[in-house]
Amino acid sequence: MVERKRWSENFSEWFNEVIEEAGILDKRYPVKGMNVWLPYGLKIMKNIEKFIHEEMERTGHQEVLFPALIPETEFKKEAEHIAGFEGEVFWITHAGHEPLDVKLILRPTSETAMYSMFALWIRSHADLPFKVYQIVNVYRYETKHTRPLIRVREISRFFEAHTAHADFEDAERQIKEDLEIFDNLMKRLAIAYIISKRPEWDKFPGAFYSLGAEVVMPDGRTLQIGTMHNYKQNFAKAYNILYEKEDGTHDYVHQTTFGMSERLLAAVIAIHGDDRGMVLPPTIAPIQVVIVPIPKKEKQEIVYEYAREIEEELRTAGIRVHLDMREKRPGWKFYDWELKGVPVRIEVGPRDVENSTVVLARRDKLEKITIKREELVDKVRELFDDIMKYLYERANEWLNSHIKRVETLEEAKKAFEDRRGIVEIPWCGEESCGLKMEEELDAKMLGIPYPEEKAKAPEGSRCPVCGRDAKFIARFARTY
């Protein structure tokens, strides 16, 4: 039976233990907020990134790789951007014993690194749209409590796509494409999420507007796992990114960005997990099927040979399979692979050899079935599909059960006491009322539902702060 008591009631402790015991990260590196990726965790993350690369290829983005150091002179060109990031920057002031003439920063994000180069590369309307991406390390001096994968000082798997366009309409088309890319990725991770348009006071520094994607974690807090920003011409004017139009005149490009990070893995671990550990979607599991032989001494070699044949059959079928031949008791192995979230476990003993059968155990539901050996490959693939469907349905049910619509601040406070996740409240649209609600609720405004046609407040609803007619539904949450 699947239990999720500790997973939800003591999530922070559960998460830290799983990260460590399942071999995702080692947190003991002697710089706070910087962690060491272990082989198993890195394999999962690279499997996620494989889908990102595929989507980038499909949509015509080209991969680039920029230096990690940015001169202070470039960083300071966009005033609003600096104001938003200056307090989080790691500065390099010396080279050896010599002070630098121009200080350098470790990139917190790459706008200020990339856009001076964009100004050299983009010349004509024929160069547009211009679409590049990279997956790199970025550095932010987080002053809040750091958490592995969630809030770190070195984001080591930071994906950022940067685009330039001839006009605002084409930039808007790019945002729609980013949302489609993100949705395709979430389907492969079986993750349910919401998209919100950030309030003016919480948009990305230098952006015209920002969108954020959130999931609800087991403790009811939300985690931002993706962002899309339309910069309009704000950065283009600061970095002089001009192009020649078809009529011979010049104009500044319109720009967008799209970002994700290892928080994607944090969401997978958190949302699909249970009290026994991780539950990995088959799409990203480094090992999709683990085979655990259960031999008796007198029939040990026969069982091992049968297990090897099964391993070879699955590998030939393109399934990521591992045969566990460690000298440990089967029960110990079951515990270990359940902790690591391997989607399907195969158990084979002497009786299976005699009857030409195989026992399949599902990690998601902790259920077992016995099948005929000749059904193996088809049945495993069928199980993968069923696991993906079940994980998504469970994640979607979790998300929807943790969004509550209320009318008053008192109802909102009660919802947060009950760890409801996301609370939706009518809002007049005034910043002062939004900030007052944040203060009263001790929560952050995520923004309004996106697309904006979903954000309109019901007829007759009132802003609970000023009492005026509400224009929007605003989402609030306690966040990571």
From Swiss-Prot:
Annotated Gene Ontology cellular component terms: aminoacyl-tRNA synthetase multienzyme complex; cytoplasm
Catalytic reaction equation(s): tRNA(Pro) + L-proline + ATP = L-prolyl-tRNA(Pro) + AMP + diphosphate
Gene3D superfamilies recorded: Anticodon-binding domain, Bira Bifunctional Protein, Domain 2, C-terminal domain of ProRS
Annotated GO biological process: prolyl-tRNA aminoacylation
Cellular localisation: Cytoplasm
Entry keyword set: Aminoacyl-tRNA synthetase, ATP-binding, Cytoplasm, Ligase, Nucleotide-binding, Protein biosynthesis
E.C. code: 6.1.1.15
Cross-referenced SMART domains: ProRS-C_1 (SM00946)
Domain of life where this protein originates: Archaea
Example GO molecular function: ATP binding
Claim: Cytoplasm is one of the keywords in the record: yes
Domain remark from Swiss-Prot or TrEMBL: Consists of three domains: the N-terminal catalytic domain, the anticodon-binding domain and the C-terminal extension.
HAMAP family per UniProt: Pro_tRNA_synth_type3
Subunit structure: Homodimer.
PANTHER family listed in its UniProt record: BIFUNCTIONAL GLUTAMATE_PROLINE--TRNA LIGASE, PROLYL-TRNA SYNTHETASE
Family under the similarity heading: Belongs to the class-II aminoacyl-tRNA synthetase family. ProS type 3 subfamily.
Role according to the record: Catalyzes the attachment of proline to tRNA(Pro) in a two-step reaction: proline is first activated by ATP to form Pro-AMP and then transferred to the acceptor end of tRNA(Pro).
Name used for this protein in its record: Proline--tRNA ligase
